[in-house]
Amino acid sequence: MLRIIIIFLCSVVIGNGANCQPTPYVILVSFDGFRHDYVEQVNAPNFKAIMKQGAHADGLIPCFPSKTFPNHYSIVTGLYPGHHGLVDNTFYDPNRKELYEMKNRKRTTDPYYFGGTPLWKLARQNGLKSASFFWVGSELSQPDLRPDYYFPYDESISDSIRIAQVVQWLKLPESERPHFITLYFSSPDNEGHNFGPSSNETKRAILRSDSLLGILVNNIRQIPLPVNLIVVSDHGMEELREVPETYIFLNEILNRSDATIKVANGGTQCHLYIEDPTRIDSIYSSVKMKAKNYSVYKREEFPKRWHYDTPRAGDLLITANPGYYIVDRERTKWLSQIEPGSAFGAHGYDPAITKNMRGIFYAIGPNIKAGKKVKAFENIHIYPLIASILGLTTPAIDGNPKVLESILVR
């Protein structure tokens, strides 16, 4: 498989020779929940080949909270969640007085919740087509905010079908062919959650991810186009244990019958929206007084590194310490069938506190230097990297083009 990736790199370089310099192509691939150190846990020849023949980072630092929706959207907008609007997988919008949940299709297709200029919108503004086989924000109800080609999220669609569709997009006539493509895989996040990041199930999922990467590269190398492949993940995974001490019970620290307190609980953090602003201080004091294995913040106390000063974040925010998990009531388990004492996984913790929240970054292609390693960086900097490869001028963003300019071939 190492030979496959080397041939791929050579073929795309030839396709982008001095006498013919078409606009490059970028495929952005996400393996959900792929922790920064997973590649070292197994024999992953395709990832390791990219380490030698392309560029990679020590880790990809997610935005706070290190959750799926905020971070996938940060990657394609170059904005912190507090600036693009998706502040968590679940949150309350005080303006509309409604709950946003990632499994609510009405919310996830509503342009109201999605700020910034996603890469597919930037591509369209510059005359380039784009495509997405799943990505947060890619299926909005307003057509001009979507990629030219997209699929509504359906986890039942096999990984092989997803790869085949990406290949078909690259084989379209030039006038119809997308120059920017996103591709999403839900593994190894599912296995990391259900069995823990150190489990054999997760290791097998890592191997499957490596195999999918090899299949994708093998297919791309047969297409004579200057394709750059960027492989990322949205976050890592922390190991927890199914024991009573792991859980922080909301009903023990908060009056859950108080309808004037709206709660959006994400497990690793919990947003509290207080209807009466004059009660914020008293509720804060009460929750803080009971603090064990968690911290509580008023919005004005949020760490500046979060860039989280937005009404969509709670008036108060409870954050679990790494290794602990917030639940609504006693005897709540991660999974009903989980055995006492066994492992499961969680994410969402402050990435500045636990390195296990870091994801991955790999890149290979004619516009990427070979054998280049960079230190861990925040995922908002991927946006200007892709824009630079495609020759696009970015709008005002949080990402900095200088962070990754050292991996680009000039």
Predicted feature descriptions by range:
Residues L2-I14:
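Sec-dependent N-terminal signal peptides
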Residues D159, I163-K171, P188-L229, I386:
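A long, amphipathic alpha-helix that forms part
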Residues V39-H84:
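Short, structured active-site-proximal loop/turn typified by the sulfatase FGly-forming signature C/S-X-P-X-R
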Residues T23-R35, A49-M51, I75, A123, ...:
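Beta-strand elements within well-structured catalytic alpha/beta cores of enzymes
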Residues P226-V227, H235-E275:
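Acidic/histidine-rich catalytic neighborhood
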Residues A264-K373, F377-L385:
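Active-site neighborhoods of enzymes that stabilize oxyanions during catalysis
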Residues L79-G196, K288, K292:
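His/Asp/Glu-rich, glycine-adjacent segments
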